[in-house]
């Protein structure tokens, strides 16, 4: 999308963190933004601060996401940009988790994206000049690590859903585009998101402090929500499928694909009658 002035955007998880940063950047180029969030007090504060409308929405419930879409269409008449950004990020070892832990995170991180697509895509397809869906995954949607089982499962899912959606939209000749946002370390409150969970005390998932996790060589290369917002804005303009926020941290992703390639090569060597994909 080239001309963004007066376009209509919906940002879930938009009352704080990356969602707020995305909303601010969209506003800066003339986009009319509606934020949705599960936290009513945060919605009220951010809506007042930015001078925009906020609608309390639990993305894990399709009825609420559908109601959000209908309200936006009723009040604004169109939706051009959808940022499925709401997410949670506590951690826990798989052996310590409950099934409720898995359901809680998948309901928000993965089903929240699916709900957004199903509720809004028909409206985006009505636009003469198309639209854009940006789904927030994570670099943990391409690599995995101990303690991140449900989180990685949900974010891998978001990557796959977005890839398939982009392929299908292209196949049908649609002017709607899809991108997946792959953020690295960002200064948000996602690591303390279990505050929104009623049964958090009994859960195997616990809030984390990224400063205590040895994932990087040297200081953690934090980005701010507004920096992430600029990357999203650039992605809407370019139509790029994969929106990396920390490309300098991509080596583990490449290493993973090399391990996959190695396993494939070993399988070919063990079964010489198969032809090499080269």
Which residue stretches match the model-derived regions?
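The beta1-alpha1 cofactor-binding region of Rossmann-like NAD(H)/NADP(H)-dependent oxidoreductases
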Residues: 57-67, 99
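SDR active-site lid
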Residues: 171-243
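Canonical Rossmann dinucleotide-binding motif of NAD(H)/NADP(H)-dependent dehydrogenases/reductases
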Residues: 2-32
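Active-site helix of classical SDR
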Residues: 117, 154
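Substrate-binding pocket helix/loop in short-chain dehydrogenase/reductase
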Residues: 93-94, 101-103
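A glycine-rich helix->loop->beta "capping" turn
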Residues: 50, 71-82, 90
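Residue(s) in the substrate-gating loop at a strand-loop-helix junction
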Residues: 138
């Amino acid at each position: 999308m080239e001309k963004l002035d007066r376009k209509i955007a919906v940002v879930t998880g938009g009352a704080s963190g990356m969602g707020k940063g995305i909303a601010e950047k969209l506003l800066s180029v003339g986009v009319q933004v509606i934020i949705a969030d599960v936290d009513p007090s945060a919605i009220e504060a951010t809506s007042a601060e930015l001078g925009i409308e906020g609608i309390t929405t639990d993305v894990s419930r399709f009825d609420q996401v559908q109601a959000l879409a209908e309200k936006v269409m009723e009040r604004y008449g169109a939706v051009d940009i959808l940022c499925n950004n709401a997410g949670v990020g506590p951690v826990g070892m798989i052996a310590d988790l409950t099934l409720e832990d898995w359901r809680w995170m998948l309901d928000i991180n993965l089903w929240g994206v699916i709900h957004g697509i199903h509720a809004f895509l028909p409206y985006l397809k009505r636009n003469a000049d198309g639209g854009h869906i940006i789904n927030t995954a994570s670099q943990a949607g391409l690599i995995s690590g101990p303690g991140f089982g449900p989180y990685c499962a949900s974010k891998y899912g978001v990557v796959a859903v977005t890839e398939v959606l982009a392929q299908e939209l292209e196949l049908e000749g649609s002017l709607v585009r899809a991108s997946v946002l792959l953020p690295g370390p960002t200064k948000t409150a996602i690591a303390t998101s279990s505050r929104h969970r009623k049964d958090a005390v009994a859960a195997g998932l616990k809030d984390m402090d990224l400063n205590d996790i040895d994932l990087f060589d040297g200081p953690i290369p934090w980005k701010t929500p507004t920096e992430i917002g600029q990357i999203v804005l650039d992605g809407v303009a370019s139509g790029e499928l994969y929106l990396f926020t920390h490309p300098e941290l991509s080596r583990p992703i490449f290493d993973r694909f090399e391990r996959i390639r190695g396993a494939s090569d070993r399988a070919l060597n063990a079964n010489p009658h198969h032809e090499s994909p080269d």
